[in-house]
Amino acid sequence: MKKILITSLLSVSLFVICLFLAWKSLSATNFFFERLYQLHAIDEQIKKYAPQNRNKENFELTQSSEHQRIFGEIVSSINSNGRGLAEISYFNSFGDKIDEFLTNDEITHLEDVSELIVYSTQIVLSLTGVLIAVYGFFFYYKVSRSRYFWKPVTTLFSFSTMVFTLILITGFVFVIGARKVFHILHELLFADKGQWFFYYQDSLMTTLLPESLFGSIAVMITVCALIYWVILNIIISKILE
């Protein structure tokens, strides 16, 4: 029972770190937004809702390359303590500025997201330090005493358990409803923060970044994190065997 508890805690902690690594890696690629843009038919969404926007005009006249650039700037800003959010603007095909992209409420929300990333970074760095110390102790114990304080389970068993856990979580999301889970998470993470829900008619941000897009991004992050987790598990197992 003790070994199962230790193994579970270590696996979950390592996966949390891998989720952060996945976020950073995919941020560097802008989450392959050019592919997601096509998958979610965001151009059609912009054509439908941008003309209805009550705050900003003529976004429907912009090109897909402009939409992808704006997404990249948003990702860059929220990974940089929110710097530059207010300056994000959209331009017509001649390079003339039309307007700033974000409203004040949207900027506040994205700054809240940025603060969450900073807080998450601090947690992950602390967790990484703890895991290095724990695994270092296990290695030292094995080398100095020629026996195990804790021996890792096989990579196949560990992988199977993690995949099973992720399948259960996925099933839970489908039962509750992806949209409802999305809203619950926002209510928990941004309680007592600025506005986080925006109607299409009031927000170019929501028009460009519909809720369904974040579902795809969540899947990408999870798959990427699982790959990192498997690689790190193999390395750790080789060291501690």
Predicted regions and their residues:
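Juxtamembrane interface at the cytosolic side of transmembrane helices
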Residues: M1-V12, L127-F182, V230-E241
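Alpha-helical membrane-inserting segments
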Residues: C18, A22, L26, I169, ...
